[in-house]
């Protein structure tokens, strides 16, 4: 492999079909040129290529133009991060999942619990954690909601612009108690436009347009979509829209600038979503977000900086439109602001790479139910209501990390000191990776992490729940070991983990003068352990790909005599098979089968169930059509007790890509 370096841009010429994942570790702009061993594109003209039957396969292995790749590296950042791939557009780009939630549901480490269908509202948790214990990143930027994890996944992006999704382990400091999920947006190719229209059962309609332009170091990705349905049962209708753009600019003198901005609006009927006693619930949310990142190398030094902002407005109606509401009832209004900034520097030297940095985050909420009482209420924009409560908090993290490679062994360690209204918290992470032989490696890591109580944990009180403003942060110590094997088109991974959590926040059944209620309490220690296995094969002809995965886990809590709401309500077993078949003449089929077995508790009871999803597509040139069905077997299943999920849902659509 020949390497040239000029003005901070590294160029590689590769004579193989292998992926470019290794370049992500550089954290730089990489320019790649690829040629097939079988032939040189210099001597191949278009007419002769079209006349030979084997050239289709050969052309798939060639890149006519050099492809500029901006590495989505999270380092330098606090902690020793270890990414695990969840989704890749290259493998599952035509899978029968139209939503990000559908993709995440199949991964053995992720528990996706939906209210409604097609991604209307979803809680995402990792390895037995809760939705509040999972950090959500978009292009490496933390956009986790400080009010409630119910809103953390409200991101203005669709699956068509998602190039990859990773689980991130090893983040220290405040936020990623159980880990993080990072979604990366990338264009289909440097210059394109894509439109999609689909429709189906239950009045479903989806329209989407996206595209990208790349010129002289500048890349602009933009997308917009509308998704609506009448609902599969009464009061599960929805009307959601997304707008998103990502702009990157690379200059040898100024470095790399990476900017993103988005807006989402959602209106959805919430039949029993948060309480089965109220079938006429309704929710309206608006989310706006933006961030800018900068990266510049100066010889052995690399400087990184970013700033971000996320605003979420929420109107929750226990009685939709006030119908049947008692006198004096008003909706719940919340507006949450999350702002953050980070700066770090890395230095590469003979003993490895050393980095140091700091970040700052500010959380604030105005609400008519959450927070401390305002002296002077503030009118809710566009509503006949007032914000009567507010709360704000400042969070700091500072870290120092180092990584080194000694032959086939990679070592990394990080120390972090976090500050918040709850005091200071030291944390750390360690990671070791051993290359056993070509294509086979083993790794182990340990991380100490924490999370702050959400504003809902602290203050939410209603007819069935009681908040607790005296809650303190949760703490966790997580250990993980694993091994990976890769040979040609086959790859496999096996891992096991153990997490000890203390000061766990959970809702505990408490007797009150008004009857039994769920009170936000801090009394539980929780031990969680599990295994994950995954194997996949990418074929050349009829079999495009096949992936088999399994995840199993168990948890035990110290306060066994208390009935808790979330601690033992987890996915006990999950198995999935994903298969893609090239039928020929432009036809392709994708089938996924998955099995779920959730742990039962004294307050919940779930039956194991199978789900089968399928998609049939036909493509020619820039045009493709498809028909797909989710829950093809019409399985009756629940992510939450009593809240039935959608039955068989058939849709069909048309896609034009130019």
Q: What spans do the regions from the language model cover?
A:
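Short acidic/polar hinge/loop motifs at secondary-structure boundaries
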Residues: 141-170, 183-186
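Flexible loop and strand-edge segments within Gram-negative outer membrane beta-barrel domains
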Residues: 229-236, 240, 254-338
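N-terminal periplasmic "start-of-domain" segments of outer-membrane beta-barrel proteins
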Residues: 65-95, 123, 180, 244
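Short strand-turn segments of transmembrane beta-barrel domains in outer membranes
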Residues: 164, 172, 179-213, 224, ...
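Extracytoplasmic beta-strand/coil segments of soluble accessory domains associated
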Residues: 101, 105-141, 145, 163
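Structural signature of Gram-negative outer-membrane beta-barrels, strongest in the C-terminal barrel
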Residues: 351, 355, 365, 381-501, ...
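Gram-negative outer-membrane beta-barrel transporters
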Residues: 405-409, 498-500, 522-602, 655-657
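Outer-membrane beta-barrel signature, preferentially recognizing the C-terminal barrel domain
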Residues: 274-297, 441, 448-502, 510-539, ...
């Amino acid at each position: 492999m020949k390497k040239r370096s000029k003005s901070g841009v590294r160029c590689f010429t590769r004579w193989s079909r292998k992926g470019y994942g290794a370049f992500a570790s550089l954290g730089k702009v990489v320019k790649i040129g690829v040629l097939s061993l079988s032939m040189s594109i210099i001597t191949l003209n278009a007419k002769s290529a079209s006349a030979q039957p084997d050239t289709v396969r050969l052309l798939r292995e060639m890149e006519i133009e050099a492809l500029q790749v901006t590495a989505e590296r999270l380092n330098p950042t606090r902690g020793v991060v270890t990414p695990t791939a969840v989704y890749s557009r290259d493998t599952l780009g035509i899978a029968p999942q139209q939503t990000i939630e559908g993709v995440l549901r199949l991964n053995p480490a992720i528990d996706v619990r939906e209210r409604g269908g097609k991604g209307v509202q979803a809680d995402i948790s990792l390895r037995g954690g809760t939705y509040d214990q999972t950090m959500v990143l978009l292009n490496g930027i933390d956009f986790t909601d400080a009010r409630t994890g119910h809103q953390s996944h409200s991101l203005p992006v669709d699956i068509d612009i998602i190039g990859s999704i990773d689980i991130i382990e090893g983040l220290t400091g405040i936020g990623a108690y159980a880990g993080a999920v990072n979604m990366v947006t990338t264009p289909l190719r440097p210059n394109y436009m894509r439109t999609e229209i689909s429709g189906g059962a239950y009045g479903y309609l989806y329209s989407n347009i996206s595209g990208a332009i790349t010129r002289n170091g500048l890349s602009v990705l933009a997308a917009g979509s509308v998704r609506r349905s009448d609902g599969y049962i009464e009061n599960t209708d929805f009307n959601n829209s997304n707008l998103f753009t990502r702009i990157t600019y690379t200059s040898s003198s100024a470095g790399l600038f990476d900017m993103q901005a988005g807006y989402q609006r959602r209106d959805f009927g919430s039949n029993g979503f948060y309480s089965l006693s109220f079938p006429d619930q309704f929710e309206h949310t608006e989310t706006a977000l933006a961030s800018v990142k900068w990266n510049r190398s100066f010889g052995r030094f690399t400087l990184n900086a970013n700033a971000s902002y996320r605003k979420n407005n929420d109107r929750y109606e226990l009685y939709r439109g006030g119908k049947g509401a008692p006198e004096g009832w008003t909706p719940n209004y919340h507006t949450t602001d999350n702002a953050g900034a980070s700066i770090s520097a890395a230095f590469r030297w003979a003993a490895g790479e050393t980095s140091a940095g700091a970040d700052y985050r500010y959380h604030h909420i105005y609400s008519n139910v959450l927070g401390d009482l305002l002296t002077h209420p503030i009118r809710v924009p566009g509503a006949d209501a007032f914000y009567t409560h507010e709360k704000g908090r400042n969070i700091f993290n500072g870290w120092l990390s180092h990584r080194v490679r000694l032959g086939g062994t990679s070592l990394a360690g990080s120390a972090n000191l976090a500050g918040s209204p709850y005091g200071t918290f030291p944390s750390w992470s360690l990671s070791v990776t051993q290359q056993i032989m070509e294509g086979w490696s083993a790794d182990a890591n340990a991380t100490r992490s924490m999370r702050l109580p959400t504003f809902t944990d602290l203050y939410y009180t209603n007819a069935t729940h009681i908040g607790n403003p005296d809650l303190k942060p949760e703490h966790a110590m997580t250990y993980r070991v694993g091994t990976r094997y890769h040979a040609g088109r086959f790859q496999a991974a096996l891992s096991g983990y153990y997490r000890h959590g203390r000061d766990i926040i959970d809702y505990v059944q408490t007797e009150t003068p008004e009857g039994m209620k769920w009170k936000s309490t801090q009394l539980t220690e929780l031990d969680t352990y599990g295994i994950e296995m995954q194997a996949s094969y990418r074929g050349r002809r009829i079999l495009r790909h096949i992936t088999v995965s399994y995840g199993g886990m168990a948890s035990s809590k110290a306060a066994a005599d208390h009935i808790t709401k979330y601690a033992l309500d987890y996915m006990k077993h999950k198995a999935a098979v994903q298969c893609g078949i090239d039928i020929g003449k432009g036809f392709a089929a994708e089938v996924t089968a998955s099995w779920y077995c959730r742990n039962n508790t004294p307050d919940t009871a779930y039956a194991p169930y199978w789900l089968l999803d399928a998609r049939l597509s036909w493509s020619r040139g820039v045009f493709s059509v498809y028909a797909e069905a989710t829950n093809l077997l019409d399985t009756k299943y629940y992510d939450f007790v009593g809240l039935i999920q959608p039955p068989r849902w058939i849709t069909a659509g048309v896609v034009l890509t130019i």
